[in-house]
Regions:
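Sequence termini and other peripheral, non-core segments
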Residues: 23-38, 43-47, 51-57, 65-77, ...
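Conserved metal-binding segment of the jelly-roll/cupin
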Residues: 96-115, 226-246
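A short, N-terminal "cap"/entry segment at the start of jelly-roll beta-barrel domains
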Residues: 22-54, 130-190, 278
Length: 278
């Protein structure tokens, strides 16, 4: 009589190794309630998840104007996701509404002010530039790097992608070659729908759930809900996908942080939707 212990043991070991290799999906909810009697709130989100990237959730209210400066060797990205206000950069005022992106670029200091009786919430994303980033930055078009980049998400260029359904509206809110190795966009649809499983080991990725977002994110054998106003890190190299149930909303920002400039070839999978001639 044959003993099946080696086979059973082998299956057990494979299953155990798969479990050990499965990476949890880090996600952190962003509180939209300021502490009592406070007019300013700042918290580091998903600390040390991505090398060279520091993310803060900042909330402002009240009449005071806040000054913010870019540290040497860094570039800043502001993603405004709730509330209204104004950013002033070199004497120019930029109206801030929910779902606006702003990059100071060569402007060293900006002023932020909240609209009366409102609270402004945003992510402040600092990217530490490597020596190669500094070299690459010099080759970028000057119009990309010397002026403030400011866009409302709805004004940004739409694109299609094979992993998404025709019902999905995708937009590039920050093209590459503005800040080295970074690009950002949005994904918006109503369920039932999905983003098909895919892998991109050449980049780190964050998702920011926008208003009413209510989806499930899968990465290898793990899954987690992603709700509105939450930040999630896709485990590097994982096969990941997103689903949304009937009558629910999928609406999030993807943020790509490429390991090197060669990885930006991935963006060629995005097919720009040409505007029809009027």
């Amino acid at each position: 009589m044959r003993k099946s212990f080696p086979v059973v043991l082998g299956v057990f070991l494979v299953t155990t190794m798969m479990s050990l290799n499965a990476q949890e999906i880090p996600v952190e909810n962003l509180s939209t309630d300021l502490p009592l009697y406070s007019q300013q709130y700042a918290k580091t989100i998903l600390a040390d998840e991505i090398k060279g990237i520091h993310v803060e959730h900042i909330a402002l209210t009240g009449k005071n104007t806040i000054l913010d400066a870019t540290e040497d060797g860094n570039k800043l990205i502001y993603l405004f996701f709730k509330g209204n206000g104004t950013v002033t950069a070199e004497g120019t005022d930029y109206a801030i509404v929910p779902e606006t992106i702003l990059l100071p670029n060569a402007v060293e200091e900006i002023q932020l002010k909240t609209t009366a009786n409102d609270t402004l919430h945003y992510l402040r994303i600092a990217s530490k530039l490597s020596k190669q980033d500094l070299i690459d930055l010099e080759t970028f078009p000057k119009e990309n790097t010397q002026h403030v980049y400011y866009k409302k998400f709805t004004d940004c260029e739409p694109y299609t992608e094979p992993i998404k359904s025709p019902n999905t509206v995708s937009r590039t809110i920050m093209p590459n070659k503005i800040i080295p190795r970074i690009a950002m966009g949005t994904v918006q649809t109503t369920g039932p729908d999905k983003v098909d499983p895919h892998e991109h080991p050449m980049l780190e990725q964050l998702f920011l759930g926008l208003s009413e977002n209510d989806v499930v994110v899968y990465a290898d054998d793990e899954s987690t809900p992603l709700n509105e106003y939450a930040l999630l890190h896709i485990p590097l190299g994982s096969s990941h996908s997103v689903t949304v149930e009937k009558e629910k909303v999928m609406y999030y920002v993807w943020m790509d942080f490429f390991l090197d400039a060669k990885g930006e070839e991935w963006l060629k999978t995005h097919q720009v939707i040409e505007k029809e001639n009027e």
